[in-house]
Regions:
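N-terminal leader/linker segments that initiate helical-solenoid repeat arrays
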Residues: 17-71, 75
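Register position in tetratricopeptide repeats
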Residues: 29, 59, 93-94, 127-128, ...
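Conserved structural position within tetratricopeptide repeats
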Residues: 41-45, 72-75, 106-109, 139-143, ...
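Conserved small/polar residues in nucleotide/adenosyl-binding loops
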Residues: 205-206
Length: 206
């Protein structure tokens, strides 16, 4: 009898934990994010539950809280690219493009061949007006893929930010030759021509 009672006492926490997990899963499925956050204990150390909590907080636009949870996960495992990208997105949504760039860079260093990480890293640098680093990052991209129209387009934006219109035009021109249907590239070239009152040249591209 004593062994049976002991066994029941041991099984109770496991059963309770499973019940709570089921409740969290069901709440997520039903988009009941407030319940998700409530069910996960403040001192929870389970990484999967903390990721779920961060997702729920993010869905409710509670970005500073989500950032806190995600940073605690990075302290435990700095190589988790999924957490790094979630953290970068939260920083972006709070207008902190520089910190977002740092997260994308860490993810990019872990997976150098991942084009999405590299693209978001450069976009975040441009958004934070860190044009010199964006220029360097674009050259790094083009060393890997010299045919990338997008790489040259962002290089042009970096040069524009650095007030180097000639280099910006050369970069946009290469991007245009690789992808003449990119409306943003065409608009950037037209903008340079208009600023220099080269209206006839502008018409050639538009």
């Amino acid at each position: 009898m004593k062994k049976f009672v002991t066994l029941l006492l041991c099984m109770l926490p496991v059963s309770l934990f499973a019940h709570v997990n089921d409740g969290i899963r069901q709440a997520m499925d039903n988009y009941d994010y407030e319940t998700v956050v409530t069910l996960i204990e403040p001192d929870c150390q389970d990484s999967l539950l903390l990721i779920t909590k961060a997702q729920a907080l993010k869905a409710m636009n509670r970005y500073p809280e989500a950032i806190g949870v995600l940073n605690s996960l990075i302290l435990k495992d700095s190589t988790n690219t999924k957490v790094l990208i979630d953290l970068a997105e939260c920083y972006k949504l709070t207008g902190n493009s520089r910190r977002a760039a740092n997260c994308y860079q860490k993810a990019m260093n872990l997976q150098p061949e991942n084009k999405f990480f590299r693209l978001q890293f450069i976009r975040s640098l441009l958004a934070s007006e860190d044009y010199e680093e964006a220029r360097t990052a674009c050259h790094g991209w083009l060393e890997r893929d010299s045919l990338s129209a997008t790489g040259y387009k962002y290089l042009g934006q970096a040069y524009e930010g650095l007030q180097d219109a000639a280099s910006a035009f050369l970069s946009y021109n290469i991007a245009y030759r690789r992808d003449s249907l990119d409306a943003q590239t065409v608009a950037r070239i037209a903008g340079i021509f208009n600023n220099n009152q080269q209206f006839k040249d502008c018409l050639l591209y538009t």
